[in-house]
């Protein structure tokens, strides 16, 4: 028996199957969305400090309102001193 035959035989399972498929699709799409973000580290051996490569001018949040980035001179001095 196929899945559709079971659903047609037991019509009370149709909403359950619908919500399970919507939840699975949402979970999969969120996982793919999260893996595309720059703060996710999959391979730590080739890139041990990925936060150094983040472009500060590119917004990392879903929505940014009036975000203006300016480098902090003290932090730049510390970064240069630790290299």
Curated annotation (Swiss-Prot):
It holds the Pfam family B12D. One of its GO terms (cellular component) is nucleus. It is found in: Nucleus. One of its GO terms (biological process) is response to bacterium. Strongly expressed in vertebrae, brain, intestine and stomach. Keywords: Nucleus. InterPro entries: B12D. Its main location: nucleus. PANTHER family: NADH-UBIQUINONE OXIDOREDUCTASE MLRQ SUBUNIT, NORMAL MUCOSA OF ESOPHAGUS-SPECIFIC GENE 1 PROTEIN. Belongs to the complex I NDUFA4 subunit family. This is Normal mucosa of esophagus-specific gene 1 protein. It comes from Mus musculus (Mouse). The lineage of its organism: Eukaryota, Metazoa, Chordata, Craniata, Vertebrata.
